[in-house]
């Protein structure tokens, strides 16, 4: 105390005690207020969490309700399709259509597809077309499978239609093609449609379908469809001389696009596309164009042989190709088409000396067809004898090819020689 008295005056000591008391009271008050604030914040957080959880529960319940409704609609659609299928199996078409036209929220696309298949299988393509239009009117969106069913059905109807009345089928196919390529964004399904359409256009001989499908073929870079279209253009060029230049231009444009894209991507061009294009060039009125086609084929096959001198015409060559005997058969078919006997002898001689490809039965048959066209009966006989010694062994088809030459009066005397050779080789052949 003495120290306090000496150091602090009485007044200062009292002030110090008062200040300490106030600070303690302030600290107590502050801690209480902070605690209350924390409780309030915690309470608000709990309320927010509860509201958020309630919202999540409501969303989950809403999602479950929607899922339940959609699953019910989907189940109703499957049940409807199952009932329609069983009725169609019992040939109860009217009852199946009655189920389709009943009011319900079920998706009926699958059921419609079943009835479409039924109509097309029966050959009722007019009824199928009417049902397809009715399907769209009733807000039942056609699926990719719907278009596939229609296109394949029309294609099969063309094969079965012996009268050749394709006007309606052509009209239906063109309209379905436009819808399929417009509404389907799936590359895989589009590719499937393109292949069906290319097959359909080949049978219908429809240039409208060709012009519609070529942009899609370029987009997918599908060799199969490209080959089909080039085959169709080949037929058009052969039987429609007045449109030959236009057709050749269209085919060349498609060929250039395919080859340039393959060069960019470093992929091989399919052999069927090359053979189809060479056959198309062989229909040209210009000898130079026909010669260029054969030069392309020999270069692609890797043969160091140039049949004709290079002309001013330039076509892009594919980077590489895995060639088979199909290319050889195509070359012989082109030679037969342009009717050049000297070319056949030169080509065959070089071909035998190259030893790069297998001379199978199909190749020999194509050579024999060339010889029959040129009327070389003695050479046909010698070729068959070489086949019997070196292979491939002659078949009944081999002798039928050469016996067609004997139907001409000039070569009737060779009939006995061919039949005797067939008998010697134990090949069953009857004189026709």
Curated annotation (Swiss-Prot):
Transit peptide, UniProt annotation: 1-33
Cellular component GO terms, alphabetical: mitochondrial matrix; mitochondrion
Disrupted gene: phenotype observed: Results in increased expression of iron uptake genes and caused ferroptosis-like cell death. Modestly affects gfrowth on the presence of antimycin A. Reduces viability on glycerol- and galactose-containing media. Causes mitochondrial dysfunction, which is likely to lead to iron-sensing defect and iron starvation response, resulting in perturbation of iron homeostasis and increased hydroxyl radical production.
Protein name (record): Pentatricopeptide repeat-containing protein 2, mitochondrial
NCBIfam families according to UniProt: PPR
Annotated function: Mitochondrial RNA-binding protein that acts as a general translation factor. Plays a critical role in the synthesis of all mitochondrial DNA-encoded oxidative phosphorylation subunits, which are essential for mitochondrial respiration. Essential for the expression of iron-sulfur cluster (ISC) proteins as well as other heme proteins related to iron-sensing, and thus plays a key role in iron homeostasis.
Species for this entry: Schizosaccharomyces pombe (strain 972 / ATCC 24843) (Fission yeast)
Pfam families: PPR_2
Chief localisation class: mitochondrion
Keyword terms of this UniProt record: Activator, Mitochondrion, Protein biosynthesis, Repeat, Transit peptide, Translation regulation
């Amino acid at each position: 105390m003495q120290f306090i008295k000496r150091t602090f005056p009485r007044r200062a000591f009292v002030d110090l005690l008062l200040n300490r008391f106030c600070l303690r009271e302030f600290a107590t008050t502050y801690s209480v207020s902070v605690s209350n604030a924390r409780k309030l914040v915690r309470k608000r957080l709990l309320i927010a969490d509860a509201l958020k959880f309630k919202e999540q529960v409501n969303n989950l319940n809403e999602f479950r309700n929607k899922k339940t409704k959609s699953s019910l609609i989907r189940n109703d659609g499957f049940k409807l399709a199952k009932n329609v299928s069983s009725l169609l199996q019992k040939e109860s078409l009217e009852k199946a259509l009655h189920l389709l036209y009943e009011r319900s929220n079920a998706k009926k696309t699958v059921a419609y597809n079943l009835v479409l298949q039924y109509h097309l299988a029966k050959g009722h393509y007019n009824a199928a077309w009417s049902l397809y239009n009715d399907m769209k009117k009733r807000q039942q969106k056609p699926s990719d499978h719907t278009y596939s069913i229609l296109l394949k059905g029309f294609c099969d109807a063309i094969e079965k239609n012996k009268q050749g009345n394709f006007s309606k089928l052509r009209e239906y196919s063109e309209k379905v093609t436009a819808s399929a390529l417009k509404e389907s964004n799936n590359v895989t399904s589009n590719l499937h449609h393109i292949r069906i359409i290319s097959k359909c256009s080949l049978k219908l001989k429809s240039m409208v379908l060709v012009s519609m499908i070529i942009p899609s073929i370029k987009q997918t870079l599908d060799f199969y469809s490209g080959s089909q279209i080039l085959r169709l253009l080949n037929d058009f060029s052969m039987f429609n001389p007045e449109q030959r230049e236009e057709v050749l231009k269209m085919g060349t444009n498609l060929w250039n696009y395919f080859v340039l894209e393959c060069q960019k991507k470093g992929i091989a061009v399919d052999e069927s596309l090359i053979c189809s294009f060479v056959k198309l060039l062989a229909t040209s009125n210009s000898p130079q164009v026909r010669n260029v086609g054969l030069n392309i084929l020999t270069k692609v096959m890797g043969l160091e042989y140039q049949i004709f001198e290079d002309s001013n015409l330039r076509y892009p060559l594919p980077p590489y190709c895995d060639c088979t005997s199909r290319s050889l058969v195509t070359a012989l078919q082109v030679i037969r088409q342009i009717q050049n006997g000297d070319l056949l002898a030169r080509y065959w001689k070089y071909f035998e000396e190259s030893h790069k490809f297998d001379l199978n039965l199909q190749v020999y048959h194509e050579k024999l067809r060339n010889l029959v066209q040129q009327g070389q009966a003695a050479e046909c006989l010698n070729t068959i004898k070489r086949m019997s010694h070196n292979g491939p062994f002659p078949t009944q088809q081999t002798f039928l090819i050469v016996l067609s030459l004997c139907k001409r009066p000039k070569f009737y005397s060779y009939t006995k020689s061919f039949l005797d050779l067939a008998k010697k080789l134990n090949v069953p052949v009857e004189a026709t």
